[in-house]
């Protein structure tokens, strides 16, 4: 799909966006210790030029303690910045009870995504819910007190109006291979359709995978989802390949004559559980659930199953601190440049949300 020079330039562009040394903390975790973070959301440009940011506060704990007592994914927050991300102020928040359906209480809030529309704003949010259950033939595999992940949507004319918006389930799956769906990612396609990418887990929780669904322009509903378009890797990302952001590859430099490409950022790891490293092995971050490492790939927008990894044998993005975790990248392409945010492991092993900005001038320089 890519020539050698295109691979080199696009990799440099991705690394300039996710610059671990240049990034600054915009939202720290609530406690300076492992298991605490803020993130799993995205940035969205408002009509007046401001930035909205959504994400969840995550506390160490076990969601199986129930709706009221469970501390884990306990709050979704929307923030606003009027100075290009220098400062953010809280606009709106949702508790687990706020996002619960009458017969499906939320056990843990997961990833979310804001999406600007012609009529206002959409908020896609995923959560673990009680009272869904595994399919009958697989029920014995469900651990006591756990739920199933689904994705919902709230719509309103303004961000503050989301507080009173009805909650509509847009994506759920009963196939045991992709039973849990979470962590929505929104991408406005060049033809006016909306691509909703998401993460899946099987009934057995042995891997993390990526799927997508298309909502045609003018339609209120998504077409049937595609669950197997981006296979897991063979090396550092053999257990997990979760897409977290889709960005149009700028049509400049070596890509001036190659339209319709998307740069995909994804989270990966060697195993869902933390592996015990052999004493003679090369010591390195390996990635596991909640401490994933970062990679990148390129997709053809019109046929996403045509894709090519930029991070084939090693991750591209590692935090210089803590466990090395660098995950949940989101990149907003704006008239003034590119805003990149991600969760970065800190020296205290919490994960802060960090930001880096790359100007169009610098992007053009890299890609030329």
Regions found by a protein language model. Give the residues of each.
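Short glycine-rich, acidic/polar surface loops and turns
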Residues: 326-329
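Beta-rich carbohydrate-recognition and catalytic domains
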Residues: 1-107, 115-183, 187-322, 334-368
């Amino acid at each position: 799909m890519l020539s050698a020079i295109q691979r080199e330039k696009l990799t440099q562009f991705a690394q300039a966006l996710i610059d671990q040394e240049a990034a600054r903390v915009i939202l720290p975790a609530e406690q300076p210790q492992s298991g605490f973070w803020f993130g799993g959301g995205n940035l969205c440009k408002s009509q007046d030029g401001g930035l909205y940011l959504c994400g969840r506060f995550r506390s160490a704990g076990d969601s199986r303690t129930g709706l009221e007592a469970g501390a884990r994914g306990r709050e979704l927050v929307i923030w606003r910045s009027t100075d290009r991300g220098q400062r953010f102020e809280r606009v709106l928040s949702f508790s687990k009870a706020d996002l619960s359906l009458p017969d499906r209480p939320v056990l843990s809030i997961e990833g979310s995504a804001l999406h600007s529309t012609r009529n206002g704003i959409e908020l896609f949010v995923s959560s673990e819910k009680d009272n869904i259950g595994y399919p009958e033939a697989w029920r014995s595999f469900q651990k006591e007190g756990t739920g199933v992940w689904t994705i919902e949507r709230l719509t309103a004319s303004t961000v503050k109006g989301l507080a009173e918006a009805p909650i509509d389930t847009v994506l759920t799956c009963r196939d045991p291979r992709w039973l849990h769906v979470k962590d929505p990612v929104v991408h406005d396609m060049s033809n006016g359709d909306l691509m909703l990418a998401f993460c899946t887990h099987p009934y057995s929780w042995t891997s993390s995978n990526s799927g997508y669904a298309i909502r045609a322009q003018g339609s209120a509903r998504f077409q049937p989802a595609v669950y197997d378009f981006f296979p897991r890797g063979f090396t550092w990302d053999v257990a997990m390949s979760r897409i977290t952001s889709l960005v149009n590859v700028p049509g400049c430099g070596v890509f001036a004559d190659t339209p319709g490409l998307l740069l995909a950022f994804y989270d990966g790891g060697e195993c869902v559980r933390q592996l015990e490293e052999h004493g003679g092995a090369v010591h390195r971050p390996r990635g596991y659930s909640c401490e994933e490492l970062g990679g990148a790939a390129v997709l053809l927008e019109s046929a996403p199953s045509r894709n090519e990894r930029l991070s084939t044998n090693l991750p591209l993005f590692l935090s210089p601190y803590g466990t090395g975790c660098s995950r949940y990248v989101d990149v907003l392409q704006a008239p003034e440049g590119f805003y990149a945010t991600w969760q970065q492991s800190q020296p205290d092993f919490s994960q802060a949300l960090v930001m880096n900005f790359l100007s169009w001038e610098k992007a053009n320089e890299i890609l030329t």
